[in-house]
Amino acid sequence: MKRIIKVTSITILAVILIGYLIPERKAMPCCTPADYNHNTFWYWPWTRGTSGCPHTGVDIFGKVGAPVVSQTGGLVLYAKDMPGKAGKSVFVLGPKWRIHEYLHLHTIDTEFLDFVKPGEQIATLGKSGNAASTPAHVHYGIITPIPYVWRAFGTAGTCNPPKRFNWRLMFWLNPTDHLPTK
């Protein structure tokens, strides 16, 4: 029994480490770096009132129907309409075990469990979900299921929310640190 636990633990650790060693090739998900505000990650209050959550990504603006490409290569974990705020959405598991989310899409051009390459079209820009009254955009965010514990004690964004939200920083990475700047 101890041997099984030891082998299983080593295997899980090896898989996690391999995921972190895979190089991350990057592409701009949509449009150009000039089409998003670099200071909107963790902006608060993002929703009406002061009880809303901080903004967990950046909104990249463009025209309805503009191509949205995968920022990195990976496995599509979700590709369908998500009722409520997100609308049509795609989630891609990429290197370093990061989940890249693309929300408010017009069309979805990939399917669950597809492998995508960096720069491969996965959707088109839209206004779905709670973005119907805003200019067309893709909300792009990066989630890490393996928490970065040290981030819970820091701050992010240009308008720091109440500390009750800081634990979420362990799981949400600032997309502007991973997008091209030019």
Predicted regions, residues:
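Surface-exposed, glycine-biased beta-strand/turn segments
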Residues: K2, A14-K88, P118, K127, ...
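Sec-dependent signal peptide hydrophobic core
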Residues: I5-L13
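Acidic, glycine-rich catalytic/binding loops that coordinate metals and/or anionic ligands
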Residues: C30-D35, F112-E120, A136, G141-K182
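Glycine-centered loop/turn positions within well-structured domains
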Residues: V58, A66, R98-H100, I108, ...
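A generic structural motif
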Residues: F61, L93-P95, I143
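Zn2+-dependent peptidoglycan hydrolase active-site motif and core
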Residues: S70-D109, P135-H139
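Active-site loop architecture of trypsin-fold serine endopeptidases
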Residues: L125-H139
